[in-house]
């Protein structure tokens, strides 16, 4: 048979199958734009600003609608009420982790963030308990953050008031806090292993936010057959895992079953206790993936928020001045900030919350999935269907936060200048899959930002009106543009 005819017939069959699958899969799914065969709605979405596209679709189809990424339907939930209903009221039903092909290639479905079922429940329960035992959200970890803040100040002083890119410094500080919990040690800022880890983490976060990776997540075959930045991400992750394995082996050689030093020790002890269980979720591969999850989630997200926060404070000098005035009044210059100060610093607390709200770090959350057939409003969501929850639609809701595109700590202050909580504040998500490092991240952001502003004035190289705070990427995460600044000792 003519090869051209074979190709035409094959493509025709694929198109027919795609059309059949999309039409038969609609059932009682929410409405949405008509998908194209094979590629779905991908051409109707701005890959560089997915949140904007979702907002436009919600105006046409309402707060719950269906998009097709390739041939697979994905339900999108938009707006506070719908997001809360999906993630809290139906938290168990939507507690599955959605499809993320590049990450599945990295960790084989292991770890905490991208695992499912019993594996996820057991590892999350163990990790939460272990992290709490090592002080997450408590005074002991606060001491660790304060010590790291002092080290950060010393490193910033070494810039001698010269212009610098803060990315490296702001990556090291939160990463070292996590290292103390996971590896039982912090690194000097010039340690070669540490520098290599920081480089790999930063590169991978940038790659995950590239438009190319969003295309690969829609058409996973590209990951296997085409060149591209995804190969660099996979190589970087392999190097990170290799380093973790090296540290695991060091821990195994010095392990004291009765005196665990850190997260790795606790996991190794759990492995030993379950060594006779052939179905145990606690294996060496699982340990490496879990440590990678804890390390990546606990460092890159906080460092990016800090970097974005300083950029916003550079642009909004009046906010910086008010925060520094409050710092001088409540803390002074002779002691380190502590978490007890926060209740007496409503404006600073509001500023930290506003940074997180404005930055909107993970705009469309990490994808969820239905663990069973779910009746959601007037629709039936089949088991295994991916769910995108728009956190942008909550954090930038103009009814809760007037002028949401403007950076303004008053969004979290009442008429008397007291701190005002908001149910719409969910940068860590909500429900069963909410970020388990929330308490740690909140402490880090408050203590590190206040310590920096206690010790330094921030000076921009450009006029404040020329400072651009628009993210350079807004796909998986929001990444601030590169910038330099002066840290001027106060």
UniProtKB/Swiss-Prot annotation:
Heme binds at residue 435. Its cofactor is heme. It catalyses: an organic molecule + reduced [NADPH--hemoprotein reductase] + O2 = an alcohol + oxidized [NADPH--hemoprotein reductase] + H2O + H(+). The modification Phosphoserine is found at residue 127. The modification N6-acetyllysine is found at residues 249, 375. Gene3D superfamilies: Cytochrome P450. Its EC number is 1.14.14.1. One of its GO terms (biological process) is arachidonate metabolic process. This is Cytochrome P450 2C28. It comes from Mesocricetus auratus.
